Amino acid sequence: MAASESERTGGGNRPMAVIINDTTLRDGEQSPGVAFRASEKLEIAQALVNAGVRELEAGTPALGEEECVRLAILRRQLPDTVMMSWCRMNSAEIHDSARVGMDWVDISVPASDLLREQKLHRPWPAVIASLKPLVQLAHRLGMRVCMGCEDASRSADETLHMLAEVAADLGIERMRFADTLGILDPFSTFTRISALRQHWHGGLEIHAHNDLGMATANTLAAVRAGATHVNTTVLGLGERAGNAALESVTLSLDRCLHLDCGIDFTELPALCRLVAAAAGRTIDVQHPLVGGQVFTHESGLHVAALLRDPRSYQGIDPSLVGREFNLVLGKHSGRQAVSGICARLGYILSETQTLLMLQEVKRFAEHFKRNPGEDEVIAMCQMRMDDQIPFEGQLQAQGG
């Protein structure tokens, strides 16, 4: 297999506390309406690697020969990247995974009684008996195995502990705890992962969905409880409400848990734009780290403080992702903000001019439902300096 570098090591043998196994190309593409072209999958994979992602869940052979061809192309393009395929309990899919050069195969096992009965129609002893030759096959073909515990969040702890014992006996190196329906909270996630950790000493991967808006929080809780690997998708793409977002998870691991996951944050904005374009999605202006307005400030109190010290109302330095903070005028601006921003643009306003400007800015924001741009602020300043009719008067004259 192509990737021989230890999965616990980053560039230059730098120890890595958490391994990102990004599944944008597999689970992310399962978002309704998302279908990446072959060229887009190649671009996304390369951009993920450029950003420091060390493992890719690259796809599933169950989609057919075209998917297998794309997986083989990915393998050739990125020979040093650890790649995993997602498979059902199906020998043909395991053979296909080896044929296209996958390093790992995630063999999905329905862990809850509900899914096991609905999908496999067999009791646990029969399921385990079927799993054993599949794991042996993967090993003979030169792949490492992750047991993907599908719907683990609805499985009993006793069942997961039994599966951990089976995994150890079969030489499986990693277990995936999948909150498939996104029903856990950080507290229950910590409890469940901690309990599993008492029975499993290999790699442990958290796969969190965002149905309750807690995928990132649940991922961090799992890491606190002992997870060594985390699944992410760019922009949180995925089934239903999506998965844990790469950009949020990696920033939170860095800032909240002080853990290194090898990510170059300056690469994330371009990566997110690339994936958004390929997925036909827009990036919300308030999306953490990469949204257009996440480093923009309007509130008068905040702007006044930021003009004195940028640290006052910024917990994340925008230079982390190659950006700068932006101060704008709007309905919530105050006199100091107006005076300070206008001064930055080269206009020193009197107290009367500042008050008139403040009224004009508020009217502008209410009328146009946006902040005035820099050119518009300059025009307003020039009008104040020239004692021209204010914007409010223009609106009244136009019947506004």
Curated annotation (Swiss-Prot):
Record keyword Ribonucleoprotein present: no
Record GO biological process: biosynthetic process; carboxylic acid metabolic process; nitrogen fixation
A family per Pfam: HMGL-like
Catalytic activity: acetyl-CoA + 2-oxoglutarate + H2O = (2R)-homocitrate + CoA + H(+)
Enzyme class: transferase
Keyword Protease in annotation: no
Domain called Pyruvate carboxyltransferase: residue spans: 18-269
Keywords from the named record: Nitrogen fixation, Plasmid, Transferase
Gene Ontology MF terms in the entry: homocitrate synthase activity
InterPro entries linked: AIPM/Hcit_synth_CS (IPR002034), Aldolase_TIM (IPR013785), LeuA/HCS_post-cat (IPR054691), NifV/FrbC (IPR013477), PYR_CT (IPR000891)
UniProt EC number: 2.3.3.14
Family: Belongs to the alpha-IPM synthase/homocitrate synthase family.
Role this protein plays: This protein is a Fe-Mo-cofactor biosynthetic component.
Protein name: Homocitrate synthase
Source organism (scientific name): Enterobacter agglomerans
Source taxonomy: Bacteria, Pseudomonadati, Pseudomonadota, Gammaproteobacteria, Enterobacterales
